[in-house]
């Protein structure tokens, strides 16, 4: 019984630590991760690059992703 309670407390502590770390913003967003709402949260070797989503010439959304610095992406038609 004590082992079950101890295990539960340890799991609770681990989950609480992970949630606290996410709230403080220590964790960075990895390559190709979305950074629309957190533009400064990409890892140090990445930049947050944003794109406008257009429908019939009208912007309907804006999406941002963490991409490699100094890399150019081109649309292949």
From Swiss-Prot:
**What's any one GO cellular component for it?**
extracellular region
Entry comment describing in which tissues the protein is expressed: Expressed by the venom gland.
Coarse class of the primary localization is secreted
* Thylakoid listed as a keyword: no
The cellular location(s) given in this protein's UniProt record come to: Secreted
Name the Gene Ontology molecular function terms of this record: toxin activity
Signal sequence coordinates: 1-20
Excised during maturation, the propeptide residues are 21-26
Designated name of the protein:
U11-lycotoxin-Ls1a
Species source reads Lycosa singoriensis (Wolf spider)
């Amino acid at each position: 019984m004590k082992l079950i309670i101890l295990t539960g407390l340890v799991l609770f502590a681990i989950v609480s630590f992970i949630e606290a770390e996410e709230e403080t913003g220590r964790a960075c967003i990895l390559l190709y991760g979305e950074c629309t709402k957190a533009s400064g949260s990409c890892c140090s070797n990445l930049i947050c690059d944003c794109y406008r989503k257009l429908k019939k010439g009208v912007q309907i959304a804006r999406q941002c992703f963490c991409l490699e610095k100094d890399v150019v992406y081109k649309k292949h038609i």
